[in-house]
Protein backbone atom coordinates (compact mmCIF):
# COMPACT_ATOMS: atom_id res chain seq x y z
CA UNK A 1 0.00 0.00 0.00
CA UNK A 2 1.36 3.41 -0.98
CA UNK A 3 2.37 5.61 1.95
CA UNK A 4 0.88 9.06 2.54
CA UNK A 5 4.02 11.04 3.36
CA UNK A 6 4.73 14.78 3.42
CA UNK A 7 6.11 16.40 0.28
CA UNK A 8 8.95 18.87 -0.22
CA UNK A 9 10.62 17.88 3.02
CA UNK A 10 13.20 15.27 3.98
CA UNK A 11 11.19 12.42 5.47
CA UNK A 12 13.19 9.75 7.30
CA UNK A 13 12.07 6.31 6.11
CA UNK A 14 14.62 4.49 8.26
CA UNK A 15 17.71 5.43 10.25
CA UNK A 16 19.69 7.77 8.01
CA UNK A 17 17.56 7.08 4.92
CA UNK A 18 15.45 9.99 3.70
CA UNK A 19 13.07 10.60 0.82
CA UNK A 20 12.17 13.93 -0.79
CA UNK A 21 8.84 13.67 -2.56
CA UNK A 22 7.33 16.15 -4.99
CA UNK A 23 3.55 16.26 -5.06
CA UNK A 24 1.73 14.78 -8.04
CA UNK A 25 4.40 12.82 -9.87
CA UNK A 26 3.44 13.99 -13.33
CA UNK A 27 5.92 14.77 -16.11
CA UNK A 28 8.85 16.72 -14.70
CA UNK A 29 7.85 16.09 -11.07
CA UNK A 30 10.14 13.44 -9.57
CA UNK A 31 11.46 12.17 -6.25
CA UNK A 32 14.93 12.15 -4.69
CA UNK A 33 16.63 10.57 -1.71
CA UNK A 34 19.42 10.81 0.83
CA UNK A 35 21.43 8.07 2.55
CA UNK A 36 23.74 8.86 5.46
CA UNK A 37 26.94 6.84 5.95
CA UNK A 38 29.74 7.36 8.45
CA UNK A 39 31.68 9.51 5.97
CA UNK A 40 28.76 11.70 4.90
CA UNK A 41 25.81 11.85 2.54
CA UNK A 42 24.87 10.13 -0.70
CA UNK A 43 22.17 11.88 -2.74
CA UNK A 44 19.97 9.78 -5.02
CA UNK A 45 18.81 11.84 -8.02
CA UNK A 46 18.68 15.63 -8.08
CA UNK A 47 15.31 16.71 -9.55
CA UNK A 48 15.12 19.06 -12.55
CA UNK A 49 14.74 22.86 -12.32
CA UNK A 50 15.91 25.38 -9.73
CA UNK A 51 12.51 25.72 -8.05
CA UNK A 52 12.74 21.98 -7.29
CA UNK A 53 16.39 21.32 -6.56
CA UNK A 54 17.22 24.48 -4.58
CA UNK A 55 14.90 23.61 -1.64
CA UNK A 56 16.08 20.00 -1.76
CA UNK A 57 19.74 21.02 -1.71
CA UNK A 58 19.08 23.43 1.17
CA UNK A 59 17.45 20.66 3.21
CA UNK A 60 20.40 18.36 2.51
CA UNK A 61 22.81 21.09 3.61
CA UNK A 62 20.84 21.50 6.83
CA UNK A 63 21.73 17.91 7.78
CA UNK A 64 25.18 19.30 8.50
CA UNK A 65 27.18 16.57 6.75
CA UNK A 66 29.33 16.62 3.61
CA UNK A 67 27.72 15.37 0.40
CA UNK A 68 30.22 12.78 -0.80
CA UNK A 69 28.31 11.06 -3.61
CA UNK A 70 25.49 11.70 -6.05
CA UNK A 71 23.83 8.70 -7.72
CA UNK A 72 21.79 9.20 -10.89
CA UNK A 73 19.28 6.42 -11.50
CA UNK A 74 19.03 7.27 -15.21
CA UNK A 75 19.57 10.15 -17.62
CA UNK A 76 16.18 11.86 -17.87
CA UNK A 77 16.36 15.53 -17.04
CA UNK A 78 13.81 15.43 -14.21
CA UNK A 79 16.33 13.35 -12.24
CA UNK A 80 19.65 14.93 -13.20
CA UNK A 81 18.94 18.66 -13.54
CA UNK A 82 20.20 19.55 -10.06
CA UNK A 83 23.63 17.93 -10.10
CA UNK A 84 25.42 21.28 -9.88
CA UNK A 85 23.78 21.86 -6.52
CA UNK A 86 26.27 19.30 -5.19
CA UNK A 87 29.58 20.47 -6.70
CA UNK A 88 31.91 18.47 -4.45
CA UNK A 89 30.15 15.13 -4.80
CA UNK A 90 31.36 12.30 -6.99
CA UNK A 91 28.67 11.49 -9.58
CA UNK A 92 27.81 7.82 -10.17
CA UNK A 93 25.70 6.50 -13.05
CA UNK A 94 25.63 3.90 -15.80
CA UNK A 95 27.61 4.36 -19.03
CA UNK A 96 24.34 5.06 -20.88
CA UNK A 97 23.53 7.88 -18.49
CA UNK A 98 27.06 9.23 -18.76
CA UNK A 99 26.80 9.32 -22.55
CA UNK A 100 23.41 11.03 -22.47
CA UNK A 101 24.62 13.78 -20.14
CA UNK A 102 27.43 14.58 -22.55
CA UNK A 103 24.90 15.44 -25.29
CA UNK A 104 23.39 18.91 -25.87
CA UNK A 105 20.13 19.56 -24.02
CA UNK A 106 17.08 19.32 -26.33
CA UNK A 107 15.52 22.46 -24.88
CA UNK A 108 12.74 22.80 -27.44
CA UNK A 109 11.61 19.24 -26.74
CA UNK A 110 11.70 19.86 -22.98
CA UNK A 111 9.61 23.02 -23.33
CA UNK A 112 7.06 21.26 -25.51
CA UNK A 113 6.78 18.12 -23.39
CA UNK A 114 6.99 19.82 -19.97
CA UNK A 115 5.34 23.15 -20.72
CA UNK A 116 4.60 23.82 -17.04
CA UNK A 117 8.34 24.39 -16.57
CA UNK A 118 9.06 26.15 -19.87
CA UNK A 119 10.05 29.39 -18.14
CA UNK A 120 12.72 27.58 -16.10
CA UNK A 121 14.48 25.62 -18.83
CA UNK A 122 16.63 28.52 -20.03
CA UNK A 123 18.02 28.80 -16.51
CA UNK A 124 18.60 25.04 -16.50
CA UNK A 125 20.52 25.28 -19.77
CA UNK A 126 22.63 28.13 -18.42
CA UNK A 127 23.45 26.29 -15.19
CA UNK A 128 23.94 22.95 -16.96
CA UNK A 129 24.50 19.55 -15.41
CA UNK A 130 27.64 17.90 -14.10
CA UNK A 131 29.21 15.02 -16.02
CA UNK A 132 29.35 11.56 -14.53
CA UNK A 133 32.65 11.01 -12.71
CA UNK A 134 32.29 7.28 -11.98
CA UNK A 135 30.56 4.86 -14.35
CA UNK A 136 28.76 1.85 -12.87
CA UNK A 137 28.58 -1.10 -15.27
CA UNK A 138 27.40 -3.87 -12.96
CA UNK A 139 26.57 -4.68 -9.37
CA UNK A 140 28.69 -2.57 -7.03
CA UNK A 141 29.02 -1.97 -3.29
CA UNK A 142 29.32 1.81 -3.17
CA UNK A 143 29.37 2.26 0.61
CA UNK A 144 28.87 -0.03 3.61
CA UNK A 145 25.14 0.73 3.30
CA UNK A 146 24.58 1.19 -0.44
CA UNK A 147 24.54 -1.44 -3.17
CA UNK A 148 24.07 -0.41 -6.82
CA UNK A 149 22.31 -2.73 -9.26
CA UNK A 150 22.22 -2.06 -12.98
CA UNK A 151 19.09 -2.82 -14.96
CA UNK A 152 17.13 -1.83 -18.05
CA UNK A 153 13.52 -1.29 -18.93
CA UNK A 154 12.68 2.37 -18.50
CA UNK A 155 15.93 3.20 -20.30
CA UNK A 156 18.91 1.13 -21.42
CA UNK A 157 20.89 2.32 -18.39
CA UNK A 158 18.79 2.20 -15.23
CA UNK A 159 20.29 1.98 -11.76
CA UNK A 160 18.65 0.68 -8.58
CA UNK A 161 19.96 1.86 -5.22
CA UNK A 162 19.51 -0.69 -2.44
CA UNK A 163 19.96 0.17 1.23
CA UNK A 164 19.70 -3.36 2.52
CA UNK A 165 20.06 -2.64 6.24
CA UNK A 166 17.04 -0.33 6.00
CA UNK A 167 15.01 -2.56 3.63
CA UNK A 168 14.68 0.39 1.23
CA UNK A 169 15.26 0.52 -2.52
CA UNK A 170 15.38 3.72 -4.56
CA UNK A 171 14.10 2.49 -7.92
CA UNK A 172 14.24 5.63 -10.03
CA UNK A 173 11.87 5.47 -12.98
CA UNK A 174 11.79 1.71 -12.97
CA UNK A 175 8.85 2.45 -10.67
CA UNK A 176 5.93 4.83 -11.10
CA UNK A 177 3.28 4.48 -8.36
CA UNK A 178 -0.15 6.00 -8.97
CA UNK A 179 1.30 7.51 -12.13
CA UNK A 180 1.23 5.98 -15.61
CA UNK A 181 4.80 5.01 -16.57
CA UNK A 182 6.56 6.37 -19.61
CA UNK A 183 8.43 3.99 -21.91
CA UNK A 184 9.35 6.18 -24.87
CA UNK A 185 13.00 5.10 -24.56
CA UNK A 186 12.26 1.85 -22.77
CA UNK A 187 11.20 -1.70 -23.45
CA UNK A 188 7.94 -2.59 -21.69
CA UNK A 189 8.60 -6.34 -21.92
CA UNK A 190 12.13 -6.08 -20.51
CA UNK A 191 10.90 -3.59 -17.93
CA UNK A 192 8.24 -6.03 -16.71
CA UNK A 193 10.89 -8.74 -16.34
CA UNK A 194 13.16 -6.38 -14.39
CA UNK A 195 10.34 -5.76 -11.94
CA UNK A 196 10.42 -9.45 -10.96
CA UNK A 197 13.84 -8.74 -9.46
CA UNK A 198 12.96 -5.36 -8.02
CA UNK A 199 9.85 -6.64 -6.22
CA UNK A 200 12.05 -8.96 -4.14
CA UNK A 201 14.70 -6.41 -3.17
CA UNK A 202 13.03 -4.49 -0.35
CA UNK A 203 9.77 -3.90 1.47
CA UNK A 204 9.96 -0.14 0.95
CA UNK A 205 10.29 1.03 -2.65
CA UNK A 206 10.86 4.69 -3.51
CA UNK A 207 9.64 5.28 -7.07
CA UNK A 208 10.89 7.93 -9.43
CA UNK A 209 7.37 9.36 -9.51
CA UNK A 210 4.49 9.06 -7.07
CA UNK A 211 4.22 7.99 -3.43
CA UNK A 212 6.47 5.52 -1.64
CA UNK A 213 5.16 1.96 -1.94
CA UNK A 214 6.24 -1.64 -1.88
CA UNK A 215 6.13 -4.94 -3.76
CA UNK A 216 2.36 -4.74 -4.34
CA UNK A 217 2.73 -1.49 -6.26
CA UNK A 218 5.61 -2.99 -8.24
CA UNK A 219 3.38 -5.89 -9.28
CA UNK A 220 0.60 -3.51 -10.35
CA UNK A 221 3.09 -1.65 -12.55
CA UNK A 222 4.35 -4.93 -13.98
CA UNK A 223 0.80 -5.97 -14.89
CA UNK A 224 0.24 -2.66 -16.68
CA UNK A 225 3.42 -3.01 -18.72
CA UNK A 226 2.46 -6.53 -19.76
CA UNK A 227 -0.96 -5.19 -20.75
CA UNK A 228 0.80 -2.66 -22.99
CA UNK A 229 2.74 -5.48 -24.66
CA UNK A 230 -0.41 -7.57 -25.09
CA UNK A 231 -2.27 -4.60 -26.61
CA UNK A 232 -0.32 -5.10 -29.88
CA UNK A 233 -0.29 -1.44 -30.80
CA UNK A 234 -3.86 -0.55 -29.82
CA UNK A 235 -4.22 1.36 -26.51
CA UNK A 236 -7.93 0.52 -26.44
CA UNK A 237 -6.97 -3.10 -25.81
CA UNK A 238 -5.55 -2.31 -22.36
CA UNK A 239 -8.05 -3.90 -20.01
CA UNK A 240 -9.22 -2.60 -16.64
CA UNK A 241 -6.92 -2.72 -13.65
CA UNK A 242 -5.40 -0.67 -10.82
CA UNK A 243 -4.07 1.68 -13.48
CA UNK A 244 -7.59 3.02 -14.05
CA UNK A 245 -6.92 5.38 -11.12
CA UNK A 246 -3.45 6.48 -12.30
CA UNK A 247 -2.77 9.95 -13.68
CA UNK A 248 -1.58 10.66 -17.26
CA UNK A 249 -3.25 7.61 -18.83
CA UNK A 250 -4.57 9.46 -21.89
CA UNK A 251 -1.17 10.84 -22.84
CA UNK A 252 0.99 7.86 -21.96
CA UNK A 253 -1.00 4.77 -22.94
CA UNK A 254 -0.43 5.44 -26.67
CA UNK A 255 3.28 6.06 -26.12
CA UNK A 256 3.77 2.85 -24.16
CA UNK A 257 1.67 0.65 -26.42
CA UNK A 258 3.25 2.01 -29.60
CA UNK A 259 6.75 1.52 -28.18
CA UNK A 260 6.01 -2.09 -27.24
CA UNK A 261 4.61 -2.81 -30.70
CA UNK A 262 7.57 -1.19 -32.46
CA UNK A 263 10.05 -3.26 -30.48
CA UNK A 264 8.06 -6.44 -31.10
CA UNK A 265 8.39 -5.68 -34.81
CA UNK A 266 12.16 -5.21 -34.47
CA UNK A 267 12.02 -1.42 -34.77
CA UNK A 268 13.86 0.48 -32.03
CA UNK A 269 12.16 3.80 -32.78
CA UNK A 270 10.56 6.68 -30.94
CA UNK A 271 6.78 6.13 -30.76
CA UNK A 272 4.77 8.50 -32.98
CA UNK A 273 2.74 9.61 -29.96
CA UNK A 274 5.95 10.72 -28.24
CA UNK A 275 7.14 12.57 -31.32
CA UNK A 276 3.87 14.50 -31.29
CA UNK A 277 4.27 15.24 -27.58
CA UNK A 278 7.67 16.86 -28.11
CA UNK A 279 6.56 18.80 -31.19
CA UNK A 280 8.26 16.67 -33.84
CA UNK A 281 5.23 15.19 -35.59
Predicted regions: what is each one?
Residues 2, 200-204, 212-281:
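Accessory terminal helices/loops
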Residues 5, 12, 41-42, 48-50, 99-152, 156-228:
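Metallo-beta-lactamase
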Residues 8-58, 160-172:
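Conserved beta-strand hairpin/beta-sheet module of binuclear metal-dependent hydrolase folds
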Residues 16, 35, 45, 60, ...:
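Divalent metal-coordination and catalytic microenvironments
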Residues 18-20, 71, 92, 134, ...:
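Hydrophobic/aromatic beta-strand patches that form the interior of the parallel beta-sheet core
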Residues 50-93, 134, 201-202:
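Active-site metal-binding motif and surrounding structural segment of the metallo-beta-lactamase
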Residues 95-99, 175, 233:
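Short, acidic/turn-prone active-site loops that include or flank metal/cofactor-
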Amino acid sequence: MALDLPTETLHELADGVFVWLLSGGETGVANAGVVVDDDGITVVDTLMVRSQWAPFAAAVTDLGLPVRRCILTHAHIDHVGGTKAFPAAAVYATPATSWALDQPMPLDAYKSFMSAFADEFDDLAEVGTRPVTHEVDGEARLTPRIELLTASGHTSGDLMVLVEDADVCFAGDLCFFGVTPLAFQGDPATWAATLDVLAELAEVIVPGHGPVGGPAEVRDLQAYLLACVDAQGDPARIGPGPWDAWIDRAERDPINVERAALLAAGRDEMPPAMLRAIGLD
